[in-house]
Structure formats: C-alpha cells, structure tokens
From Swiss-Prot:
Family the UniProt entry places it in: Belongs to the phosphoglycerate kinase family.
Catalytically driven reaction(s): (2R)-3-phosphoglycerate + ATP = (2R)-3-phospho-glyceroyl phosphate + ADP
Protein name: Phosphoglycerate kinase
Cellular compartment(s): Cytoplasm
Pathway assigned in UniProt: Carbohydrate degradation; glycolysis; pyruvate from D-glyceraldehyde 3-phosphate: step 2/5
GO biological process: gluconeogenesis; glycolytic process
Keyword Nucleotide-binding carried by entry: yes
Keyword Transferase among UniProt keywords: yes
Binding site for ATP: E332, G358, G359, H360, S361
Organism annotation: Thermococcus sibiricus (strain DSM 12597 / MM 739)
UniProt cross-references to PANTHER family, sorted A to Z: PHOSPHOGLYCERATE KINASE (PTHR11406), PHOSPHOGLYCERATE KINASE 1, CHLOROPLASTIC-RELATED (PTHR11406:SF23)
Amino acid sequence: MFRLSDFNYHDKVIFLRADLNSPVKDGKIISDARFRAVLHTIRYLLEHKAKVVIGTHQSKPYEEDYLTTEQHAEILSSLLGVKVKYVDDIFGKCARDAIKALKPSEVLMLENLRFAAEETKQNPLEYCERTHFVRKLSPLIDYVVNEAFAAAHRSQPSLVGFARIRPMIPGFLMEKEIKALTRAYESLERPKIYVLGGAKVEDSLNVAENVLRNEKADLILTGGLVGHVFTLAKGFDLGDANISFLDEKGLIKLVDRAEIILNEFYPYIRTPVDFAVEYKGERVEIDLLSDKQWIFDERPILDIGSRTIEKYSEILKEASIIVANGPMGVFEIEEFAKGTVEVFKAIGESKAFSIVGGGHSIASIYQYNIKGISHISTGGGAMLTFFAGQSLPVLQALKISYEKFKNKKELNQ
C-alpha cells in the first residue's frame, strides 16, 4: 500500500473518504470520537497545501439518525480551527462547482453520501467504478485518501470505486488500524484472549470459529447477546423473557451453530456463570445454578454478574494479547454498566497489548474514562470481519490501487 508521504499534495484536490458516522440524540451528534480520529490526516493534508474534499455517510435511509452532514462540517470546523464549507450536494453541479472553487488548505464537506442511492448498495469494484458518483467526481480529483476503516468491510462507490482510476492512499488512521489489528492477529505472544460481547452474534461466531481453528486464540470470553447464545448452546435455560427477545432479534437460529463450535472447542470458550436483571427496581444477580432462575422468565438479562466479572478479570490479568469487541451488557443503564466497565478496566490494567472495538464499546470507554487500552479501534463490523479471517474490500482496493499506480511519475515528487 501507499503511504501519505509518498505524494506531493500542493494544490492537489484530495477526496478524503472518512467514516464520521456518529451517535445522535434528539437530532444532535453526541460524540466527536470519530472526528478526532481523522484530525491528524486532515491537518497533514492542509499543511501540505491540499484542497480537501471530505465524504462520509451518516446512518442509513429511514433511520432517525439519518442526517445531513451540516453538523459534521460544524464539528470538524471547531476541532480543526479551520472553516469547513458544507455543500448540500454529492456529485451534482453544486458539488462540482464547490470543488472547483477550492483553494489550497481549504476544506469542503459533501452531503451525506448515502443520500445517493448508489452508496446504499454493495457491489464489486468493477461496478462501483462505473457509478455516477465516481464518473462525475474523478475528473476533479487528483488523489483519494481513505480513512474509513469502520466501513472497510463494505464495497461501495466512495470506498472502493476510485481504486483503479486515481491513486488511493491509506490515511494515518487506516494505517494505524491495519498495523494494530495485524499485530494482534499474527502475534505469537501468549496467552491470547478474545472478549466477544454485544449484539453482533453471527459475526462473533465467525471470529470464534476462525481464531480457534487457526490457533490465533487461546481462550474466548463471552458476554452480551453473544454470551446468551453460547449459554443456551451449553444447555442452560435463560427463561421465556430472554428466549423471546433473542427470537425477535433472529438470534435463536444461531444457537445450533454455537453448539457446533462448542462441541469442537468447548474448553476454550467461557460463558457467564451468573447474570444481572432488574427486579423490584434494583440490580439482582442470579447464579445459573441457583434456584432463582425463574426470574429469567419474567426479567430480561441486562448484564453479566459479579462472579463472572471476577473470573474474567483474573483471566485477563495473565494475557499477553487481548482483542475485545462489544459490551457485556446494557451499559447505557448505570446499574448495568458494571460488567462492561469492570471487564474493560481489567483489559486496561493488564500488561497485554489490547484492542477494543465496536461503537458501543468505544462509547463506554469514553463515558467511564477507562484508561490503559493500547488501541481503540474505530471499527466494529470491520474489526470483526478482519478477525474472522475474511477479506475487507477497502484493504483489497488499497492494494489494487498501489499495484496500478506504484510507478506513477508524480510519486515522491
């Protein structure tokens, strides 16, 4: 792959594909974490007198947080200390005229890329490069800088479509993500522990199967809905309330697959031994072997219990490499943040090289000011895809672009 230092950006138009997709409450963006993650790259380009055109998506059609990128431009302006112009267009005449009008060290924010139908579909690179988006903008662009690691598992026009048309370069964030994840995956340091929580159960099953089969993990600790599915696969009854919830989410069908994985790797997958529910207005912890399991019929599980936290924390202390994705429970409710916070604190306090990823995981880390984690990944789905051993279209596109343009005359000039 290229590096940012390979090119001269003076007076060049750079399309910077970022992933600034952020949590929203009451119509307002409530986290600037992903904005801060790309500041280094933007500042580098501005210092080298580039004309920077930023493209990002925000949510997807019909969702409440499917907003314009006007707020994104305002937040970025505030963080950069530089005016970021916003244009409510993507590749139409208004957008193209705004790009043509840019001067060196100026920044333009395009409209939410998913307002264009082409950006809501996934297609091979060959199709993406023939879209209106790529055909209209490529004549105006000199280089593409890709910082959208969080979307690296998607194959959409803005993410891969320019790869064979213009040199596509990983930004500092993309480079950092690839380096950290590769180290964790390939490292021979032991023990290597994976912590899989949250709601992306199928993706987590893919990770568990891949890292255990290829001896990339010594132990997997589970929580969140991932833990629920593995607990059911072990034959425990989690009650009507929880089984109904998993069924509504389409996750019950994954119990059989979890059971197959357990049959092959049983000693290496740990599940919670107790859970926490809300009962009569309080946090109540129920041991799986106790006579109080009837509460699971009435109350949904909201967190792992104290015994599980203690067991997981002891295991994490001895780790050399830790990869964690997803919370242990419903951390948004303070009484049920305990599992997530304590497990992530244990990760931070360990001597291990540690990676934590996933939108909810990142939110909990910042909310509870957890320190000591080696690398906080901006990617959730992309990170899981990587550790599942599957190809990431954006990384493939970066390699394709390098092969196409590595002998280009402008290189290093």
